[in-house]
Amino acid sequence: MNGQGASADPQLQQFIEIESQKQRFQQLVHHMTEVCWDKCMDKPGPKLDSRAEMCFVNCVERFIDTSQFILNRLEQTQRSKGSFSETMTD
């Protein structure tokens, strides 16, 4: 090796970050599927009835809404911490 290691390769770092994001997304989808399945499926049959279908739609939409709310809240918190620390250093 050249002594710099893998941390010096920006392309490798970007690839690892993208793969990590893919993995987190897959975990989120798996979790959402599991939660909504347990909530909406009473008895699996040959096809989805309209009640179960509507339950899945609502479950996924609430999951997305909640995730978006949490992300927005975290972003606001980070911004307020950043502006607070900037005023402290001025």
From Swiss-Prot:
GO MF terms held by the record: metal ion binding
Note on domains (UniProt): The twin CX3C motif contains 4 conserved Cys residues that form 2 disulfide bonds in the mitochondrial intermembrane space. However, during the transit of TIMM8A from cytoplasm into mitochondrion, the Cys residues probably coordinate zinc, thereby preventing folding and allowing its transfer across mitochondrial outer membrane.
Motif placement: Twin CX3C motif: 36-59
GO cellular component, one term: mitochondrial inner membrane
Family: Belongs to the small Tim family.
Bilayer topology: Peripheral membrane protein
Protein name listed in UniProt: Mitochondrial import inner membrane translocase subunit Tim8 A
Keyword Membrane recorded: yes
Transmembrane helix among keywords: no
Gene field: timm8a
Cysteines engaged in disulfide bonds, as pairs: C36-C59, C40-C55
Record GO biological process: protein transport
Alphabetical UniProt keywords: Chaperone, Disulfide bond, Membrane, Metal-binding, Mitochondrion, Mitochondrion inner membrane, Protein transport, Translocation, Transport, Zinc
Stated role: Mitochondrial intermembrane chaperone that participates in the import and insertion of some multi-pass transmembrane proteins into the mitochondrial inner membrane. Also required for the transfer of beta-barrel precursors from the TOM complex to the sorting and assembly machinery (SAM complex) of the outer membrane. Acts as a chaperone-like protein that protects the hydrophobic precursors from aggregation and guide them through the mitochondrial intermembrane space.
Top-level taxon in the UniProt lineage: Eukaryota
Family matches, as InterPro entries: Tim10-like, Tim10-like_dom_sf
Subunit (UniProt): Heterohexamer; composed of 3 copies of TIMM8A and 3 copies of TIMM13, named soluble 70 kDa complex. Associates with the TIM22 complex, whose core is composed of TIMM22.
Subcellular location: Mitochondrion inner membrane
